[in-house]
Amino acid sequence: MSIWIQNAKIATMDSANPLAESAVVVGGFFAFVGSLQNAEAYLQEHPCPDISVLDCGGEFLMPGFNDSHMHYLHYAKSKSSVDLTGCTALSEVILRMRRGFEQSYRPDSGLWLIGEGWNQDYFTDEKRFPTADDLNEITTEYPLLIMRSCFHIGVLNQKAMELYGISADTASRFGACVETDARGIPNGVVKEEVLDDIKSFLPAPSAQQLLDLLVDTQTDLFRNGITSVQSDDLKYMPADSVYTILSLLREAGETGRLRLRIAEQALLPQKSELDQFLYEKGIDDSYGNRTFKISCIKLLADGSLGARTALMRKPYHDAPDTKGLAVYDQASLDALVLEAHKNNIAVAIHAIGDGAIELCLNAFARARQEYPYLHPRHGIVHCQITDAKQLRRFKELDVLAYIQPIFLDYDIHIVTDRVGRELASTSYAWKTYIDSGVHTAFGTDCPVESFRPLPGIYCAVTRCDLKGNGPFLAEQRLTREQALYGYTAAGAYASHDEAVKGKIKAGMYADFITLDTDLLTCPAEALLHANVTRTYIDGTCVYNNVQR
């Protein structure tokens, strides 16, 4: 079916034709974008007998949002977890978990009761991590796990520690990733790679059930105008089912059951896993189809700022006994990046602290030096704490910045305390990235934050939190055009899709949305209240909430 779009303010993200009033869709692609008069002329020359008119009623139309880094499967699974976001006291965390246990937990299920989203910085009673003792008040017979909002810290009760194999006798095996008390007894707090391994250890649905969950969840994103995501999911799949699930996702894209475009950021933190992926399974960034593909290899170099596990070069300003946690030393990270690079596959590395970012930049520099004729689009995910020299190295090494503007909502209240005023003054420097020509793609890290793009756009253009507090480094404010580009065309570039999506332009996928608010001209506060009214993928409406 063909569509003639009329009566819309179209923000195209195409610098050669930034605004339009009409477009024609044929066969799932934009065939024409421009003025209404020229659209009429185009249709006279290229008749479309089956064409229908989409009268947008003067609404704002733009490309569908592209979240450049999230955890889609984790979000889908988290809908069945106990929601601990917004807890303002440790006692409230325990109360919500107790209610979840009493009201919805089935002891015969063999599953763990999971809670997600707490943040000790918001507690008004005790500003500390929960412990096993706290969770043991609920039950010691069945396994409980609660994860901090950053998902780099978790807390197990006694039963969960027993099942996973954490005890006083084994604690030393896990190093700094398992906390112990003064007696050397684990207190239930687990971090980083141990928590990641626990996620894979948990009892899980079958591969087919996971696929059903992913398909059923896509409507949540369509309601918010998201048509594409770049998602880190592999560690949320049963280890023995990863390749089955990848195959099912590819098949679901081919059959049309999966409409959301997913570019997998394949988390493969061990050399053996990467080798199996590349050489035994023969998977690379050509795997997939128009809907599901592999876009890059994903690695993690450190933890989170809120939990003080992000790796810093100097001790934390507010915790001088720690610099955070390094997942790799330089040689180990170099080896992984080099293996992907020589296969011309991009690597996107989670790095928040300036210490981790330095490791990443060094690894990319070495790979480019060894194989200068290859140009995979390496990137750093989060890239929050930086100094001026590191900001320059992003451009020098052609490293992508995957940023999450919504992080300002929380981080502006802690960053100076965590890293000191001098280093904070060159951090979250998104305008510096863009002005220097660094490809800067926006995302949310959902479910760390909500996947809703509009709050992130608000933070990007105001540098304030969602209550209007701020601004933090006002000189780093972005224009509306820059913010919308970051959530559309820049994300397409990050997944090697800039030729087919991210813009309203002839020859590109007809993935577009309409909103009841002009995002280019409305007051900043109105960004938080704008509504997506329609979402289209391949010229087909997948969400419609038009009220007139």
Features from the language model and the residues they span:
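Divalent metal-binding segments
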Residues: S2-N7, A11, S15-Y279, L299, ...
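A structural microfeature
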Residues: A31-F32, R534, Y543
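Non-cysteine beta-strand/loop elements that form the S-adenosyl-L-methionine
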Residues: H71, N289-T309, D398-D409
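Acidic (Asp/Glu)-rich catalytic clusters
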Residues: G253-T255, G282-F292, Y371-Y373, F394-E396
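Short proline/glycine-enriched turn/loop segments at secondary-structure junctions
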Residues: D285-S286, C522-L527
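His/Asp/Glu-enriched, well-ordered alpha-helical/loop segment
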Residues: L338-A348, I352-H378, H382-C383, A388-R392, ...
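Glycine- and charge-enriched low-complexity intrinsically disordered segments
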Residues: N544-R548
